[in-house]
Amino acid sequence: MSTAAKQNRSTSRVSKKKTAAPKEGAAKKSDKGHKYEYVELAKASLTSAQPQHFYAVVIDATFPYKTNQERYICSLKIVDPTLYLKQQKGAGDASDYATLVLYAKRFEDLPIIHRAGDIIRVHRATLRLYNGQRQFNANVFYSSSWALFSTDKRSVTQEINNQDAVSDTTPFSFSSKHATIEKNEISILQNLRKWANQYFSSYSVISSDMYTALNKAQAQKGDFDVVAKILQVHELDEYTNELKLKDASGQVFYTLSLKLKFPHVRTGEVVRIRSATYDETSTQKKVLILSHYSNIITFIQSSKLAKELRAKIQDDHSVEVASLKKNVSLNAVVLTEVDKKHAALPSTSLQDLFHHADSDKELQAQDTFRTQFYVTKIEPSDVKEWVKGYDRKTKKSSSLKGASGKGDNIFQVQFLVKDASTQLNNNTYRVLLYTQDGLGANFFNVKADNLHKNADARKKLEDSAELLTKFNSYVDAVVERRNGFYLIKDTKLIY
C-alpha cells in the first residue's frame, strides 16, 4: 500500500470526518456567495497574504518575451477608477497607474496586448510595493489566470479577421481552457467599460512624460517610448512591413514591423511604441529599432489623444518627393492612396489572390481586396492607346486614333505586377484598370481623353508610367474580382 493511502486510512473503525484545507491559491466562495471577490486597484491590501482578484484597464504593455529557459514574462500598466492619471501631464509618481507582471512557462499563456483601453481580468495575483508603486504579480504556471475583454464593440483580432462582434461579456482571449463570468461580474465589466471610454475621451492617458518626442530620439541612450501616427505601411518582404512614422514634433522615422507579431498596424492609425532605440548606423533615413519585447499598441475609438494626433499629423510627402527625383530611390515610395472607407481592409498578397482565391473559403466570400505590388510593365506600351473609345451597346472598345471624338472614352490599361509573396517565382500577374463601369476612373487624376490629340494629358500619363515602373515604387490598391480578373477601384495616384 502506498504511503499516501496509509496516511488517508483511519486508525479507528469510527472516526470523525475531517474537512480538507483548501489548496493554496484555489478559488473559494466569498462571504457574499461569489466565487471571486474583486478588489479595486488602490484598495487592494498590501498586507494580506490572500490572492487578489481584479478588473483593470490596460494602458500599456510589453510584448511577451522570454527571460530564461523556463520563463516568459509580460509587463502591463493598468488603471481603474481608484488609480489613474488625473492630469494631462503625469506627476511621475506612483499615483498614475499600477503595474501587472505576468509569468508563464509558455509564450501562449501570456496576453498579447494590441490596444490600449481594453480590459483585463486577473485571478489570484499577489501585491507588493516596488519602487513605491503598486505591482501585481500573477504566476500563470502556478494558479493565476487572466482574460481580456474588448472595450470597443469588436476586438482587434475580430477587426483584423473581419469577424462579427460577440457578446460584450465574452473575453476575446484568456489563459485557461475555459473562461466563465458570473452574474456579479457583468456590472463590474459594464461599468469599467463605460469608465474606460470616458477616461480615454477626457484625458490623454499616455501623458507627455511617458514617451519621447522623435526630435529628441537621437539623444536617448537606451530604450524609449514613442507616440506617433503611421503614415505608410510598406510590405518589405513576405514577413516584414516597414512603417513610416511621424509624431507631433514633425519628425519622420521608419521602423520594421513583423507581420505575425503586429498584424493590426494600419496606415492612419495612431500608435504607442513601447521600447524602441535609435539606430545610429542608418545614414539614409532615421530608423527606430524594435526589440523582442517591444510592442506596438493602438488606442480604443474614444481616445482623445489618438483623435487629436490623427487630425494634427499630416504627411507632406517631402521624403518621397525627394526620393523620386533621384535616379535610384533608396526609400520605398507608395505612389497611391486608397479611399478612406477601405482604411481598415487588410492587405492580401498576390499569392493568395491568384493562387488561393478559388480554394480559400474566406477569400471566396469576398470580392473586394486590398493589395500592394510593384509594376514591372504596363500594357499597351504606347501611352496613346491607354484610352479607348467604348460603345456601351456592343460593349466593345476601339482605338481613338483618327476618331472623331464622339462616344465614351475609358482607360483600358493592364499592369504586370509582382509582390513579396511572388518574388521568387517566374510569374507576373495582371491587374487591370478598365474604367467602363466607373471602377478606377480617378486612378491617374487625368480625364480619359483622346491621347492621340491631347498632348498635355499624354505627357502627364507618360510621367505616371515612369513613376509606376521606377525601382522602389509601389502601388497600394483596392481591387475588385470580376470574372476571374482583378480591377482597380477606389485608388488614386498621389504623385
Curated annotation (Swiss-Prot):
Its main location: nucleus. One of its GO terms (biological process) is telomere capping. It holds the Pfam family TEBP_OB2-like. InterPro entries: NA-bd_OB-fold, POT1, TEBP-like_OB2, Telomer_end-bd_POT1/Cdc13, Telomere-bd_alpha. Keywords: Chromosome, DNA-binding, Nucleus, Telomere. GO terms for cellular component: nuclear telomere cap complex; protein-containing complex; telomere cap complex. PANTHER family: PROTECTION OF TELOMERES 1, PROTECTION OF TELOMERES PROTEIN 1. May function as protective capping of the single-stranded telomeric overhang. May also participate in telomere length regulation during DNA replication. Binds specifically to the T4G4-containing extension on the 3'strand and protects this region of the telomere from nuclease digestion and chemical modification. This is Telomere-binding protein subunit alpha. The gene is MAC-56A.
